[in-house]
Amino acid sequence: MMRRTLENRNAQTKQLQTAVSNVEKHFGELCQIFAAYVRKTARLRDKADLLVNEINAYAATETPHLKLGLMNFADEFAKLQDYRQAEVERLEAKVVEPLKTYGTIVKMKRDDLKATLTARNREAKQLTQLERTRQRNPSDRHVISQAETELQRAAMDASRTSRHLEETINNFERQKMKDIKTIFSEFITIEMLFHGKALEVYTAAYQNIQNIDEDEDLEVFRNSLYAPDYSSRLDIVRANSKSPLQRSLSAKCVSGTGQVSTCRLRKDQQAEDDEDDELDVTEEENFLK
């Protein structure tokens, strides 16, 4: 009878060990994966910040409507990264940290299991010793009685630790299920809040892009290509109002001026080319150093 009770307790302890090991394994994996998820989200936020900077830099070089549309888009996209930062902080606090605490919780449960196993082993040892004593000295009542007393003490201690372990594991299972519900509910809530805000921001950003007036900007671009040269037009009017002799003299002056200007431009261009060559050589030397 005593042997069967001991075997039943051992089977129960093994089942509890399996439950604790299962939580230790899977909660550890969940913690690592959720932590990686949060890190990836934080990196996405960092890349988005770089994208915002580049969009603003590009917008500064563009035509008015495109510039305004891109800058407004960048503002909305930057706002989204503020929400993403809040998402990262909430996930860390509400999901990753609670999972981390299970490392300590599992360690405490393993200590409880260890204490129970120690008591069970002591009980099994006393039972074996009693059986040997009965076989070797069946008539020695004093030794047998002493062994029975030791066995009774060990059995009581094992029973007490078993009840404590069973109660502890029951509380552990209840808390585990409650925590799982809380953690995953928090995860879903945080993600829904972020994506809800993201939908609003992306809608505004989309509208900013759609509001870009292509025709107006194209007209601005064309005007920049064919800007009116008022000084040239004024020279033509003045030339038409002069006498033939004045026109001839003016033509010579213009021709001379053109030659000087052309020579000067060529010299300036040559100087710039020389400077560029020097810069290229300097950069090449720096690269090879």
Swiss-Prot record:
Mutagenesis / variant outcome for changing residue 107 to A: Reduced membrane-binding and significant reduction in membrane remodeling activity
Family: Belongs to the CIBAR family.
Chief place where the protein resides: cytoplasm
Bias kind Acidic residues: ranges: 271-289
Complexes and interactors: Homodimer (via BAR-like domain). Heterodimer with FAM92B (via BAR-like domains). Interacts (via BAR-like domain) with CBY1; this interaction is required for targeting FAM92A to centriole and cilium basal body. Interacts (via BAR-like domain) with CBY3; both proteins form a ninefold symmetric structure at the flagellar base; are recruited to the annulus in a mutually dependent manner and regulate annulus positionning.
Sample GO molecular function, one term: phospholipid binding
CDD domains xref list: BAR_FAM92
GO biological process: cilium assembly; inner mitochondrial membrane organization; limb morphogenesis; membrane organization; membrane tubulation; positive regulation of smoothened signaling pathway; spermatogenesis
Disordered as annotated region, ranges: 265-289
SUPFAM superfamilies: BAR/IMD domain-like
Top-level taxonomic group: Eukaryota
Organelle transit peptide residues: 1-47
Region entry BAR-like, spans: 10-220
Name the UniProt record assigns to this protein: CBY1-interacting BAR domain-containing protein 1
Record note on what altering residue 266 to A does: Reduced membrane-binding and significant reduction in membrane remodeling activity
GO cellular component: centriole; ciliary basal body; ciliary base; ciliary transition zone; cytoplasm; mitochondrial crista; mitochondrial inner membrane; mitochondrion
Linked pathology: Polydactyly, postaxial, A9: A form of postaxial polydactyly, a condition characterized by the occurrence of supernumerary digits in the upper and/or lower extremities. In postaxial polydactyly type A, the extra digit is well-formed and articulates with the fifth or a sixth metacarpal/metatarsal. PAPA9 is an autosomal recessive condition characterized by one or more posterior or postaxial digits.
